[in-house]
Structures are given as C-alpha cells and as structure tokens.
Amino acid sequence: VKFGLFFFANGQDTTEQYRLLLEAARFADAEGFSAVWTPERHFHDFGAPFPNPSVTSAAVATITSRVDVRAGSVVLPLHDRLRVAEEWAVVDQLSDGRAGLAIASGWNPQDFVLAPGNFEKNKSLVRDGIQELRALWSGEAVRRPGPGGEERLVHTYPRPRRDEVPLWVTAAGSAETFSLAGELGCGILTHLLGQSWDRLEDNLADYSEALEGAGYGIERDRVTVMLHTFVAEDSRTALETARAPMTAYMRSSMSLFGLKSPQSHGVGPASDAAMRELLDHAYEEHARTRCLIGSVDSCLPLVERLADLGVDELACLIDFGVAADEALGALRNLAVLRERCEQL
C-alpha cells in the first residue's frame, strides 16, 4: 500500500496552510511518499487556500523531484476543458511527468456560478470531459465556435511530458460513479465518510467489473482512499490532539459523516451538551475505524483491512485543523507506518 498526502485546509491561517503544504511536500518527496494531492474549493473559508489545484501542484512540482503532484480534484464541469488541458500539461512538464488528476462532477450549486448552465448535466460532462482531455493531450484537435459563430479547429499546447496523464474519478459512494471510472479506465479516489465498509466493498467490485468489461488490464486498477490522518507516538495523544479540530470539522459537515442533529429526534434546537455528546461519540467511532488517527500500531489494522479490499494507495489528509507544526511533526510517525505497510 502506497501513502500520499492530501490537503483540504480546514480553518487555518492561509499563510500557515501554504507553509504546511510546501514543508510537508518536501518531506513526502524525501521519504518516498507516492503523491501530494491538493483540492479545488471555491467561495467558502473551508478549503479557502485552494481555488486552483494546478497552481498549487505547480508550486509543489518545482520544489520536489520524485513525489507525484495531483489534483484531488478538478471539478471539470466548472471549466473549459481547453484550459484544463493546457494547465495540467504545464504541470506535467514542470514536474517531469509527475502530474495526475482526479476528476469530480461537483455538487455545490454555489460553485456553479462559474458555469451555471452545467449544474444539471454535471455527471455527463465528466464522461465527455475525460475523453476530450485525453484527446487533447494526445495531440488531437477539437472544434470550437469562434467570434461571429465561425467554427475553429484548435490544438492545445504544450503537450504533457508523458503520453498519458493518469486520471482518477472522484466518488463519494455512488455505484454509478465507481462503474464510470472503470468504463473509462480511470482510477478511483474515494473516502469512508458516510460510506459503509459493505458499500465500499460492493462499489470496488463494481469498479473492477467495469474496468475488466471495458477491456482494461490490471495496471489501470488504481484505488485511492482519503483518510484524515494524525499519527502520534501513542494512541491517546493522537486521539486527544485531533479531537477538537475533527469535531469542529464534523459539526460543519454533519451530512457528510452521516450524522443527524439531536433536534431531528425531538422538538426544539439541540442543546450544546447534546451536540457535544453526539459529536464526541461520532469522533471516537470515526477516529478508530475510518481515520489514521492513533499510533503506528493502532493504525495498522485499518491499513490491512483496506489493502484486503484492493485499495493500493492512501491519501492522508493532514490539514484538518491540527496546528501546522504538530501536523508536520506527526509526519515522521506516518513515515514509519508507511514503511511498515509497504508490502501489504
């Protein structure tokens, strides 16, 4: 199982967030991690430092030499595919062939102020968009309307460093999305938030079946799972250090974690005490069974379970609110875990 780093920027000072990104990227490059993933986020302080993963990936590319630099994810329906093809070809050139993209359909109506006509057809645009990106990177031309309605034939430049830039499809839990990734010969980027173990197993089976049905070989079978991560010397230290930032994150994203407010079971608003109790219980369950929060030894069973399901890479989200220096310090323990899991 390979280990990469994943960023999403929950509630931290932007300057500190960029420092964490760049210092962690240098560490990942030196220690043999697989990739550094940065997201695309818009119009909200949650994820605010990351409006364009091609920019952050270009920054990471210029200070590293081995680690892959990837988007987690590009929300393709928000953009002109010509620009996406151009930007990521530049990243692939700057990195000497280390670029990769996970492609997402998008879900937040607020984001679609960038492309309001695409919201209702966002799913179909992912399929079409992936096919067009591959065509552009291979040197094919596409037709686009120009001034006065005149149709023009255009190629994008530069070409990527490699013949093919690896692609993933981002899937939150929809079986349809897992199957689409297989049909297109893409990897899968997913998570365990609101997705049960049984559902993940079924979805991965659908993915493998679709991949095989489309005629792709085992080399295309790439399954990456994002996990909130903080590995300390002992489990108790890790659990307590991560508790406040994780519960704050869970409070702001309850539906993502499959949680219901206490007020949904009765009348009137939930009391602070009831909400704290709910979040504390949910944190304990998620931290122990769906996150790499603990010691090296306590995190091993989760990695083994994921490996048994066919997961070959973990994208370790380290910037969920833990102080930057604490997150950086914990990377040494994560590197030990990575070494222990190399042969899984």
Residue ranges and their predicted role:
Residues 1-63, 67-68, 163-165, 333:
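N-terminal beta1-alpha1-beta2 module of alpha/beta enzyme domains
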Residues 3-7, 36-38, 69-72, 99-103, ...:
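Hydrophobic faces of well-ordered beta-strands that scaffold small-molecule active sites
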Residues 6-18, 74-82, 162-173, 229-232, ...:
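Active-site mouth loops of central-metabolism enzymes
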Residues 15-27, 87, 171-179, 296-305:
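Short, acidic/polar
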Residues 80-186, 198-214, 218:
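Internal, glycine-rich beta/alpha segment that forms the wall or movable "lid"
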